[in-house]
Amino acid sequence: VAIAVLAASLAACMTDSGDQGRGQGGLVYTDDRGVADQPFPADYRTQVLAFLRTYLNNPAGIRDAEMAEPVQRTVGGRRRYVNCLRYNAREIDGSYRGVAQRAIVYVDARLDRMIEKTDDLCAGAVYAPFPELEKLTR
């Protein structure tokens, strides 16, 4: 019974963003107060590196890493800072899967989630080399 209560309480901390009308899908781990005046994520590069170190199966040996600076975009009807990222990561077997493009959404200057289907979020993004990502280790 205690395990079921713990699991239910942890599930309450995570919500499906589709349920919140954001329309982008994925899990959301931060409380979105819905304020329109979002602070700029000054340490976005550090946040992205920390996230990708745990997100990627093999964070070593990344190629072709590029990132755009955060800009304000409308995500699910709310203004958020979003930055776009391109990289070619290794699979577990050491092969490369090809360049992936992702959008990273920030709430209250903290990385909230990564969106795989970037659609309009990354349209017109100006990318610059992201050598720190190519130097990432496990």
Language-model segment annotations:
Residues 9-12:
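C-terminal motif of bacterial Sec signal peptides marking the signal peptidase cleavage site
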Residues 14-138:
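Cystatin/cathelin-like cysteine-protease inhibitor module
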Residues 1-3:
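Bacterial N-terminal signal peptides that target proteins for export
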